[in-house]
Amino acid sequence: MNSALIMQANLLLSLVICGLAQYVTGITAFLWLPFLLAIATLMLLPLQTRYSPLRLDYQEKVLLLYSGLLVLALLGTLLQQGGMVTIIGFKNELALSLLLPCLLLGFCRESQIYRIMKLVEWVFYLQIPVVLFQVLVVVPKRVAMRGEFEKWDSVVGTFGGDPMGGGNTGALGFFCLLVMLIKLSEFRHGLISRRSVAFHILAAFAICVLAEVKFVILLSPLLLAWVWLSPSYVRGMKSYDLKRLLLIALAMTALVAVAVMVLAASYSSAFEGAGQQGAIALFIDSLGYIFDPNHINPETGELGRVTTLFFWASNGDHHGLSNLLFGYGLNTTNHGSTLPGFLNPLFNVLLDSTSLSVLLWEVGLMGTLIFIALIVLLLWCCRPRPLLDRLLLSTADVRLLSYQPAFIAFGIACLLSLPYSQLLMLIPVQQFLFYFVLGAALVIRSSVRQATRSCEVS
């Protein structure tokens, strides 16, 4: 069985096919396809041919406790909401996490991860013409129909949405962030030229600016610095080169400054009646609602980012302490689902504006802590250490190992996004990227562990 082909099908279905199909037809039922393929992947796991015994160390065995979180979420939903809501909630929020245990248990080998990552690169190249089409054709059409103020979230690449109503710009931004991190790590390992890394980072950053993904724009310099300073599995890698680090810092600072000015000008043109505020002041003011503990959008009822935490702390025990600790069940906050959750009408607000809010309401404080703790443990145990001699490695081996610092940084970015966006709990594209990256990091870690054990034996 060619498991790499199955995982590549997961990738193309999640990142390209479903998004484009939904974007063109407006049919959201296409989003069931990644769920069905994830279930099929899990069912095919026992049929996987093993070329060596599966050996998990104690840290990897602890990660299998993730199944406990799934049981907690599914059983709590089934008892409180019934079978149909359980299926829909699992499909919307947790189904793609099945890819993580599949990869942990050996569904793909390291060579197959390498092939899949090459496909990720081609998916990025595909975004460029799609984004240009959306900028040159879709955005002007939408502005002409609905006005300058309605142009937000128009640039979504192949990640899906409504051409006239916005889409998954955040997921596009995170995908571009992953590409930036990978290319910088490859450059640091001496695998690509300065021209290549500059092209990929500039192209990815430009897409983030066009898509107006402020979170990625402001966070990317810190994560790129993390990748540059991170240790590697390859011995002899410098922890840092001060001159290059300063150049990268200056370049990223300049890029962020340009991005902020472009976004500020865009906001200024959209808010024509914004008084005497300057463009930069208007941009900074647009971020203010994020930290407002009492922000509620009067038109949509959507809570602000920080507001969601205060609102949960005040109302999370509405049906008792057990719901505060273990949640109300999956899908109970999802206002855009086939079966909308009952909590939004109950409180007359939208509770699913951030992934952290969704977790707290649906799996409770205990489930949220378990989820975050397991992801932190995974990132910690996958951190690279200099164990392998470069002279004994092929170029393909070094390239595969170079992915690990980028994967760790991307996982950190996704964790930091929990209190900011709903991507990780509600958007299949982001869910696939997150769980695949974590699973691939485990595969690379396992291959390094086996290689070092073989060297010790010999």
What name fits each language-model region?
Residues 141-146, 150, 296-366, 383-391:
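Long extracytoplasmic/lumenal interhelical loops at the membrane interface
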Residues 8-16, 199, 361-362, 372, ...:
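Loop-to-helix entry and N-terminal half of a specific, functionally important transmembrane alpha helix
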Residues 179-182, 405-458:
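Transmembrane alpha-helices of multi-pass inner-membrane enzymes
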Residues 1-78, 84, 111-118, 185-195, ...:
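Transmembrane signal-anchor hairpin modules in multi-pass inner-membrane enzymes, especially those
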Residues 117-144, 163-233:
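Alpha-helical transmembrane segments of multi-pass inner-membrane proteins
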Residues 1-4, 37-51, 175-190, 312-314, ...:
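Hydrophobic, aromatic-rich transmembrane alpha-helices
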Residues 228-294, 318-319:
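A membrane-periplasm/extracellular boundary helix in multi-pass inner-membrane enzymes
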Residues 60-71, 83-108, 115-124, 128:
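Aromatic-anchored transmembrane helix interface
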